[in-house]
Amino acid sequence: MNNNSSSLSIGNKLFKSRLLIGTGKYQTLNQMQESIINSECEIVTVAVRRVQSSESSHKGLMEAIDWKKLWMLPNTAGCTNSEEAIRIAKMGRELAKLSGQEDNNFVKLEVIPDNRYLLPDPFGTLEAAEALIKEGFVVMPYINADPLLAKRLENIGCSCVMPLGSAIGSAQGIRNESNIRIIIENSNVPVIVDAGIGVPSHAAEAMEMGADAVLINSAIALAKDPKSMAEGMCKGVHAGRKAFLAGRLVEQPLANPSSPCTEISKSSYVQ
């Protein structure tokens, strides 16, 4: 979408921050809280299945976040088919309401039957998206970097598309650059690069390409110093966005001197 607006528009909500972060994988809730603050994010994802399970790592998570300041993005992580994703999305909407966000219909849609590579199922994602949109959800689908699928999801009413930069948690950065560029160029909804971002330069690269936002979890939560990495990611996103808006110098194969070469004697050149 890459418009020049200072705000990120998703559904009927406007956000100043273009960095979304996840709440999983932190060693402690305190680390998560500090990282959220340093990231300056406004949207945090919550894995509905994990929050409602007995996993000790997620106990107290909902209470540790100030939902008056942050917008909850329930996600369907762990769902392997469309039926399961639809059910978990509805549970996520109720979870958001319980946190005080009565008008929150957001869902990050993940349908991942593949446990090894964690690649999203395009057919299951499309099927679930169609059903959830009919039920009033603001659907934010996680997809492979497939321009045709991205356009199809936009056309059925998804509020954004979230192509992966590379495999989840791989920290490989943007490995699907050409396809993501096509998605950005042809999209009329925000494009949020999700998965694979490992360092701030990866986040900056995504934003320089014209992505509207990035979503990051593992790179922050599993860093040696999560709160410092969160700050770095925040600055990377800002830098990349500014570079995109400024308009970068076009790459070219030959040198182009920054100082004039007029009135320089030919004899002064090194032979």
UniProtKB/Swiss-Prot annotation:
GO CC entries: cytoplasm
Source taxonomy: Bacteria, Bacillati, Cyanobacteriota, Cyanophyceae, Synechococcales
Keywords, ordered alphabetically: Cytoplasm, Schiff base, Thiamine biosynthesis, Transferase
Name of the protein this chain belongs to: Thiazole synthase
Major localization listed first in the record, in broad terms: cytoplasm
GO biological process, alphabetically ordered: thiamine diphosphate biosynthetic process
EC number(s) from the headed UniProt entry: 2.8.1.10
Function: Catalyzes the rearrangement of 1-deoxy-D-xylulose 5-phosphate (DXP) to produce the thiazole phosphate moiety of thiamine. Sulfur is provided by the thiocarboxylate moiety of the carrier protein ThiS. In vitro, sulfur can be provided by H(2)S.
Entry GO MF terms: thiazole synthase activity
SUPFAM superfamilies the UniProt entry points to: ThiG-like
Binding site for 1-deoxy-D-xylulose 5-phosphate: G169, A195, G196, N217, S218
InterPro entries noted in UniProt: Aldolase_TIM, Thiazole_synthase_ThiG, ThiG
Keyword Ribosomal protein attached: no
Cysteine pairings via disulfide bonds: none
Stored Gene3D superfamilies: Aldolase class I
Family stated for the protein in its record: Belongs to the ThiG family.
Species this chain originates from: Prochlorococcus marinus (strain SARG / CCMP1375 / SS120)
Subcellular compartments: Cytoplasm
Catalytic reactions on record: [ThiS sulfur-carrier protein]-C-terminal-Gly-aminoethanethioate + 2-iminoacetate + 1-deoxy-D-xylulose 5-phosphate = [ThiS sulfur-carrier protein]-C-terminal Gly-Gly + 2-[(2R,5Z)-2-carboxy-4-methylthiazol-5(2H)-ylidene]ethyl phosphate + 2 H2O + H(+)
Pathway membership, UniProt: Cofactor biosynthesis; thiamine diphosphate biosynthesis
Assembly and oligomerization: Homotetramer. Forms heterodimers with either ThiH or ThiS.
Active site: K108 (schiff-base intermediate with dxp)
